[in-house]
Regions:
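Terminal peptide-recognition signature
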Residues: 5, 22-23, 41, 53, ...
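Glycine-rich beta-to-alpha active-site loop
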Residues: 72-117, 121
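STAS-typified acidic loop motif
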Residues: 1-21, 48
Length: 190
């Protein structure tokens, strides 16, 4: 059985306190279900998550913060698969980097553009991205806040698959492939 967790905060699925708390609560609820063998993390509509809610910038952080959500995804009792359409940016990409497998629709856009706003990716993206794609590719993205399309993301190893229907594709990933994958944070540093 698969569990689907959807980020649903139109128009761009910006990650705010309610989304962070909802993700942690959903993961905790699923942890007690022995029938679930994979979790699919997707965005409602045509966007995965366009990053943190800029309306919360400068406000005191309310728990759980995004690093706690990333840690919960990465330590989930079953593999989590990111199924992205549209924007998978900033905190959205950091959520995807915490997943064991990443699938994107051909029109997806992936990156850590928050540096353009003077914000450093603060939820492990600067550590996980180089471990996954290598230092050269990571340095072509992070310092300039450059975003890339699915084809390039697949080429550099940021995603594992491209599919028109990422959620359906996530259901078809062989369990052995998921089990063989270690968390990105445990990959060797470049």
């Amino acid at each position: 059985t698969a569990a689907l967790i959807e980020i649903d905060r139109p128009p761009v699925n910006a990650i705010n306190h309610d989304i962070r708390a909802g993700l942690v609560a959903a993961l905790a609820a699923i942890a007690g279900d022995n029938e679930v063998e994979r979790i699919i993390l997707a965005g409602a509509g045509d966007i995965f998550a366009a990053g943190a809610d800029a309306g919360e910038f400068g406000l005191p952080m309310v728990s759980p913060d995004l690093p706690a959500v990333v840690a919960a995804l990465e330590s989930a009792p079953v593999p989590v698969i990111a199924a992205s359409r549209g924007a998978c940016l900033g905190g959205g990409l950091e959520l995807a980097l915490a997943c064991r497998w990443r699938i994107a629709a051909p029109t997806a856009q992936l990156g850590l553009p928050e540096v353009i706003l003077g914000v450093v990716p603060g939820s492990g993206g600067t550590q996980r991205l180089p471990r996954l794609v290598g230092m050269k590719a990571a340095l072509s993205l992070i310092p300039e806040g450059r975003s890339i399309r699915t084809a390039e993301a697949l080429q550099i190893g940021l995603i594992d698959q491209q599919d028109d229907d990422p959620v359906a594709a996530a259901l078809a990933v062989p369990r052995a492939d998921l089990d063989a994958r270690q968390p990105v944070s445990e990959l060797p540093a470049p």
